[in-house]
Design a protein with these regions (language model features):
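Terminal, non-globular segments
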Residues: 172-181
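Short glycine-/aliphatic-rich beta-strand segments at the starts of folded cytosolic domains
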Residues: 126-142, 172
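Structural motif
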Residues: 25, 53-54, 91-94, 135-137, ...
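C-terminal regulatory domains involved in ligand/effector binding and gene-expression control
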Residues: 1-75, 197-206
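Short amphipathic alpha-helix segments
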Residues: 139-157
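Conserved short beta-strand edge segments in small beta-sheet-based binding/regulatory domains
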Residues: 158-163, 190-206
C-alpha cells in the first residue's frame, strides 16, 4: 500500500470579480458517497446561488469527476479539476459556489475565477500524508513506563494518552514495517515480559 497526500477536514477560498463571488469549499472525501454527500450539503446551504461547480479526485478506482453546472463548457469544473491534479492531492472534493454579480466575465474571466478560488482553498487547507500504519499497545510496570515511552517516541511512534491502572498501557501508531526494531527494544527493556499487540495495517494520516 502506497503513501498518498490529501487534506485534513475542510478549507475555504474566495475570489471576487465584477461583483461575482466565487466561494470554493474543499473537503476530504475518500469515497464517491462522501464526495456526493459534501456536494449536496453545499448545494443545500447555497440554494440561491447561480452555480455550484464541483470537481473531485479519488484513489478509489482512480476516479476524477467534474461539473460546470451550467457555466460554459470547460470554464469551471475543468480548471478546478486541473488545480487538484497539479496539487498531487487525492481523496478530496472542491465545490465552488458562484453568486452572480450581474456582469458577464467571459471565458477567460471564468477560468481565472474558478482556478483562483480553488487555489486559495488549497492554500488554506492542511495537507497530510496518509500512510499504511499499525496500531500497537504494550502493558508495562510503572517503573518501566518512562523508558518505554522514550523508546516509542524515539522510534517515531505517535502516542495516544496512556492508561494508568495496576500497570501502564501504552498505545501508539507507527508506519507499517517499521515496528520490528522497537518491539525488540521493548522485549529487552522488560526482559521478555512485554505483551505487545499489533493490529492489521490500515491507512491513517501520519
Amino acid at each position: 500500500m502506497e503513501d498518498y497526500r490529501t487534506i485534513r477536514g475542510t478549507a475555504i477560498g474566495e475570489y471576487e470579480e465584477k461583483k461575482s463571488r466565487f466561494i470554493a469549499q474543499l473537503s476530504f472525501a475518500d469515497s464517491e458517497e462522501k464526495a456526493v454527500a459534501f456536494l449536496e450539503q453545499v448545494r443545500a446551504a447555497n440554494r440561491t446561488a447561480r452555480h455550484n461547480v464541483y470537481a473531485y479526485r479519488l484513489r478509489e478506482g482512480s476516479r476524477e469527476r467534474y461539473s460546470d453546472d451550467g457555466e460554459p463548457a470547460k470554464t469551471a469544473g475543468t480548471p478546478a479539476l486541473e488545480v487538484l491534479q497539479h496539487s498531487g492531492l487525492t481523496d478530496l472534493i472542491v465545490v465552488i459556489t458562484r453568486y452572480f454579480g450581474g456582469m458577464l466575465l467571459g471565458t477567460g474571466g471564468l477560468v481565472r475565477a474558478y482556478t483562483t478560488a480553488t487555489s486559495r482553498a488549497l492554500e488554506a487547507a492542511e495537507v497530510v500524508t496518509v500512510r499504511s500504519v499499525v496500531a500497537l499497545d504494550v502493558t508495562v510496570d510503572y517503573g518501566l513506563y518512562e523508558r518505554a515511552d522514550l523508546l516509542i517516541r524515539a522510534a517515531g511512534g505517535k502516542l495516544a494518552e496512556p492508561e494508568f491502572i495496576d500497570k501502564v498501557i501504552l498505545r501508539w501508531q507507527m508506519p507499517e514495517h517499521t515496528e520490528g526494531p522497537l518491539l525488540t527494544q521493548l522485549q529487552e527493556l522488560t526482559r521478555g515480559t512485554a505483551n505487545v499487540t499489533v493490529s492489521e495495517p490500515f491507512y491513517a494520516a501520519f
